[in-house]
Regions:
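Short, exposed beta-strand/loop patches in secreted or surface proteins that constitute
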Residues: 89-93, 117-122, 141-146, 206-216, ...
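An acidic-aromatic
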Residues: 114-192, 246, 253, 260-266
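C-terminal motif of bacterial Sec signal peptides marking the signal peptidase cleavage site
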Residues: 19-23
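Alpha-helical transmembrane segments
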Residues: 14-18
Length: 297
């Protein structure tokens, strides 16, 4: 299944509350805070959709604008992360030591015939990512990094195009794949320190650009908070007038061509509690060696 690595990285940055803080933002901004939706909440650990309610003060007030193939932004000054809406999310994560965010990718997945829903969670040094269909009731894959056991698991489910592609490949190679009716998994070592799974890498004074972001799919205008990483990539956090986080946008610019590319996810919910069982591998999953019988000749 094709999955946007950039938007997953942005989402994880939000989930991990700047433990990958090349991708977290803050600020104020202003205009008509619209909302957009597709899909429903995933039942893993969260059901509310909220964020901060106060906005930061800006230190300047220019009003330039830029546009891309997906959205239009305006510039309304800068602030620091500590004074921003996103800073409120960060502080909630730091206070609780855990967070779960549910997103729906706005790019259609042709392989699985859906707008993928992603559930991303952090608890201590454990990280979880689930990809499902838009409504969240059909799971395609899970990525589990267990900070307590230092083990990682990737689990693929029979309902996914990826799983069926693997099954087809082994079948064409003469293997007996009759047992491939349950999830399969691969295990790998996980070092949370190397992966940056920490809530300590946090700069309250990080610069945040304030403004607005217009979502071209429905014309909604959001308060935007943008952080630019050392590579020039922008992570844009979009809030409605109530302070709820509605969109995560990752914007990159090709240095040679100047082409702007965006990956966008619709935020369905954020909560600050995560069920520990989320980080345990599905007991029904098997290894491929258990499910595949090689050809005899």
């Amino acid at each position: 299944m094709r999955l946007s690595k950039r938007i997953a990285a942005v989402a994880l940055a939000a989930v991990m509350a700047v433990s990958m803080l090349t991708a977290c933002g803050g600020g104020g901004g202003g205009s008509n805070g619209g909302s957009s939706s597709s899909g429903s909440n995933n039942g893993s650990s969260s059901s509310s959709s909220s964020s901060g309610s106060s906005s930061g003060s800006s230190s300047s007030s220019s009003s330039s604008s830029s546009s891309s193939s997906s959205g239009t932004t305006t510039d309304e000054g800068t602030t620091t992360l500590s004074k921003s809406r996103t800073g409120i999310i960060v502080n909630n994560v730091l206070k609780n030591g855990q967070v779960c965010i549910v997103l729906v990718n706005d790019e259609y997945d042709e392989d699985n015939k859906t707008y993928p829903q992603q559930t991303l969670a952090l608890r201590g040094k454990s990280i979880y990512q689930k990809t499902a269909n838009e409504s969240g009731d059909t799971v395609f894959s899970e990525l589990i990094n267990d900070g307590e056991t230092n083990k990682g698991y990737y689990v693929s489910y029979p309902e996914s195009a990826e799983y069926q592609g693997v099954k087809e490949l082994y079948t064409k190679n003469g293997c007996n794949t009759d047992k491939m009716t349950v999830p399969y998994y691969a295990e790998f070592p996980y070092d949370p320190d190397k992966e940056g799974a920490s809530l300590n890498n946090f700069d309250q004074n990080q610069k945040v650009e304030l403004g607005t972001y217009t979502y071209k799919k429905n014309g909604a205008v959001y308060h935007s908070e943008t952080v630019t990483d050392k590579y020039g990539h922008k992570s844009i956090y979009c809030y409605d007038n109530s302070g709820s986080l509605k969109l995560l946008v990752e914007r990159t610019v090709d240095k040679e061509t100047g082409k702007v590319d965006e990956s966008i996810a619709i935020v369905k919910s954020i909560t600050y509690s995560v069920n520990p069982s989320l980080f345990k591998r599905n007991p029904n999953a098997k290894t491929l060696d258990e499910l595949i019988v090689p050809p005899t000749n």
